[in-house]
Amino acid sequence: MTWSADILTLYPEMFPGPLDKSLSGKALEKGIWNLNIFDLKDYGLGPHKSVDEKPSGGGPGMVLRADVLDSAINDCFKKDRPMIYFSPKGKPLDQEMIERFSVINGVSIICGHFEGIDQRIIDMHDIEEISVGDYILSGGEIATIVFLDSLVRLLPNVLGNGDSKKIESFTDGLLEYPQYTKPNEFKGLKIPDILLSGNHKAIKEWQENQSLSLTKLRRPDLITKKKDKI
């Protein structure tokens, strides 16, 4: 079965966007995955197709209405796949989570806006809240593109070299080692001699040491996380 993403958004024109380029675009063209876009405004109320209201209890901004979202979800989304909503309150997105979603038949995604969506919709439909980082975006579309770009490359027959995804950052819980290519010397900077030695055992050891050192320096939290899994 082809992996597919069903997306509910106020801005359907934002898709596929960059997802029709590079690896994800080629995979989309080949039918390795499908992208289905639904316009939330089609389910809006009244002559102005209203989809939001002021927050109950007061506060700034607007909240996407539960009745509008429920109608759209029931009409657009399949019952047999998980629903995702990107929110700063969600669980942090990581490689392990991406891999979990890549081995099922697809996901349904709600792109939020304004102050978010009515909590009752999250509770009623058992929606998984996910955060792409400790910062605020204008809407869920950009987060959705980040999520899908990362996921699609894990699908079968997307990457040309099957070993590529095995050695990337986060795949083994660490950051990837530095990469070099020709010319061997550039503006006085040389490729490390070990990488040109042909000694595969020594090269692998160098790569592992570099990976560990970089992770300790830039993402020590990953070291702790890796130890906790052992």
Identify the role of each PLM range.
Residues D6-L8, N36-F38, P82-I84, V107-I109, ...:
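Hydrophobic/aromatic beta-strand patches that form the interior of the parallel beta-sheet core
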Residues F170-K226:
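Long, charged alpha-helical interface segments
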Residues G59, G112, N199:
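Conserved RecA-like P-loop NTPase ATPase core
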Residues V63-H113, D118:
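S-adenosyl-L-methionine/SAH cofactor-binding core of RNA-modifying enzymes
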Residues I117, I121-F170:
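Structured adenosyl-cofactor binding patch, chiefly the S-adenosyl-L-methionine
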Residues K41-G46, I136-G139:
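A short acidic, often aromatic-flanked loop/helix-cap motif at beta-alpha or helix-coil junctions
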Residues T2-D42:
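Glycine-rich, flexible N-terminal cofactor/catalytic loop recognition
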Residues G44-P47, D52, S56-L69, F77:
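A short aromatic-anchored loop/beta-hairpin motif
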